[in-house]
C-alpha cells in the first residue's frame, strides 16, 4: 500500500518534505499547494509535481501569468490520504476544518499550537503515540533538536535549563531580522520548554535570543542529573543516538558555518543537515551537572519526522523500521 500524500505549502519546509516523500517506497506525492506562481511553484512544475492553488481566490494569480494548475486544495484533498500542512504558523489550524470535512488525515508543523493535533511528535521519543492517529503535529525545529538529545539522556535528567540562540531568518527570508542587534525573548521562561513537554515528560526551563544569522540555531544546555553520568557515558549515548552527530572543534568545526559547509560537502539537497550537531568538546559533567552545546539546521531537522509521522498514522511500520527506512532514503548518517 502506498499512502497518497499532498503537501499544503511549498516553501522552506514544504518543498523539503515533498522531496522526502518522493524518496519513500511506501508513499506517493500527489501534489503541492501554492498561493502564488513564484519561482518555487515553477520549479515544482519543472520537477513534474502537480501544483494546486490554495483556493478559488488565488486561482486568478496563476491564470494571469498563464500558469496552469491542477485545481485547488479542495481538489487535491479528494485524491490524497493525508495532507502535510506546511503553511505559516496559525494557518494550519484554520485549514483543519477543510481536512476534517474531506476525511483526510493531516500532519501539522510546530508553528501550530499543540491542541491542533492528537499528539505532538518526535519519532524516536514517542512514535507509538501517533499510531493510527488522524492529526499529528511535528514540533518545531528547536523543540525537535532538544527532544532528540534530551530523550537520549532522559532517565538521568532531573531538571534541564537551556538557552536558545535562534537564527533571525531563513536564508531566503528578506522580511525578518534583526540584522544588527541581539533580540531577547523577554517572556521568561520561553515557550520552548513547555513545547518539549508536549513530547516527553521532563522538567525543563528555557530562555531565547534571536541573533543576526540565517544558517542554524544553537542551544546551550545544562542538565541537573538525578543519576550518576560521566562525560564518556554521554558521548557514548549520543554516538548511539540516531539523528544526532558529534562534531569536534579540533577537526575544524569551530562554528555553525563549518557545520553547514559539512552538509554542503555531503552534496545533500539544499545542504540539509537532518541530524542535530553536538560539539563533542562541549560535553562536560561537573558534579551533578551535565553541559553540552548543539546546533540545529532549522530548515531540515523536522523533515524526517514528517515522514515517520505519516508511517505511524497509517501503521505502515514500527518505530525502528520507519526510522531506518527514512534515514536510508535521505542519506542520514546514523
Curated annotation (Swiss-Prot):
An example Gene Ontology biological process: lysine biosynthetic process via diaminopimelate
Enzyme class: oxidoreductase
Keywords of this entry: Cytoplasm, Glycolysis, NAD, NADP, Oxidoreductase
Cytoplasm recorded as keyword: yes
A Gene Ontology term for the protein's cellular component: cytoplasm
Annotated PROSITE patterns: GAPDH (PS00071)
One Gene Ontology term of the molecular function aspect: glyceraldehyde-3-phosphate dehydrogenase (NAD+) (phosphorylating) activity
Residues the entry annotates as binding D-glyceraldehyde 3-phosphate: 140-142, 192-193
Top-rank taxon: Archaea
Localisation per UniProt entry: Cytoplasm
CDD domains: GAPDH_II_C (cd18127), GAPDH_II_N (cd02278)
Protein's pathway: Carbohydrate degradation; glycolysis; pyruvate from D-glyceraldehyde 3-phosphate: step 1/5
Gene3D superfamilies: Dihydrodipicolinate Reductase, domain 2, NAD(P)-binding Rossmann-like Domain
Family statement: Belongs to the glyceraldehyde-3-phosphate dehydrogenase family.
Binding partners and assembly: Homotetramer.
Name of this chain's protein: Glyceraldehyde-3-phosphate dehydrogenase
Native source organism of the sequence: Pyrococcus abyssi (strain GE5 / Orsay)
Gene name for this UniProt entry: gap
Amino acid at each position: 500500500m502506498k499512502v497518497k500524500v499532498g503537501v499544503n505549502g511549498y516553501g522552506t519546509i514544504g518543498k523539503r518534505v515533498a522531496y522526502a516523500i518522493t524518496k519513500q517506497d511506501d508513499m506517493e506525492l500527489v501534489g503541492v499547494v501554492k498561493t502564488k506562481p513564484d519561482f518555487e511553484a515553477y520549479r515544482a512544475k519543472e520537477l513534474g509535481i502537480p501544483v494546486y492553488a490554495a483556493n478559488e481566490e488565488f486561482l486568478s494569480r496563476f491564470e494571469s501569468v498563464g500558469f496552469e494548475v491542477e485545481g485547488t486544495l479542495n481538489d487535491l484533498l479528494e485524491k490524497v490520504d493525508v495532507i502535510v500542512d506546511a503553511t505559516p504558523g496559525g494557518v494550519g489550524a484554520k485549514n483543519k476544518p477543510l481536512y476534517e470535512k474531506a476525511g483526510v488525515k493531516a500532519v501539522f508543523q510546530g508553528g501550530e499550537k499543540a491542541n491542533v493535533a492528537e499528539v505532538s511528535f518526535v519519532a524516536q521519543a514517542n512514535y507509538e503515540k501517533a499510531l493510527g492517529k488522524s492529526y499529528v503535529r511535528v514540533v518545531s525545529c528547536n523543540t525537535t533538536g532538544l527532544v532528540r538529545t534530551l530523550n537520549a539522556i532522559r532517565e538521568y535528567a532531573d531538571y534541564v535549563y537551556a538557552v536558545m540562540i535562534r537564527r533571525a531568518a531563513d536564508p531566503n527570508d528578506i522580511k525578518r531580522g534583526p540584522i544588527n542587534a541581539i533580540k531577547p525573548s523577554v517572556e521568561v521562561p520561553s515557550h520552548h520548554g513547555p513545547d518539549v513537554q508536549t513530547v516527553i515528560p521532563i522538567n525543563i526551563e528555557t530562555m531565547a535570543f534571536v541573533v543576526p544569522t540565517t544558517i542554524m540555531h544553537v542551544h546551550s544546555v545544562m542538565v541537573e542529573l538525578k543519576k550518576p553520568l560521566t562525560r564518556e557515558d554521554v558521548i557514548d549515548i549520543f554516538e548511539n543516538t540516531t539523528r544526532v552527530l558529534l562534531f569536534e572543534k579540533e577537526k575544524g568545526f569551530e562554528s555553525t558555518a563549518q557545520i553547514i559547509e559539512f552538509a554542503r560537502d555531503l552534496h545533500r539537497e539544499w545542504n540539509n543537515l537532518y541530524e542535530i550537531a553536538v560539539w563533542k568538546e562541549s560535553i562536560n559533567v561537573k558534579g551533578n551537572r551535565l553541559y553540552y552545546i548543539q546546533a540545529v539546521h532549522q530548515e531540515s531537522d523536522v523533515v524526517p519526522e514528517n515522514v515517520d509521522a505519516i508511517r505511524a498514522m497509517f501503521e505502515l511500520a514500527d518505530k525502528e523500521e520507519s526510522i531506518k527506512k527514512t534515514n536510508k532514503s535521505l542519506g542520514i548518517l546514523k
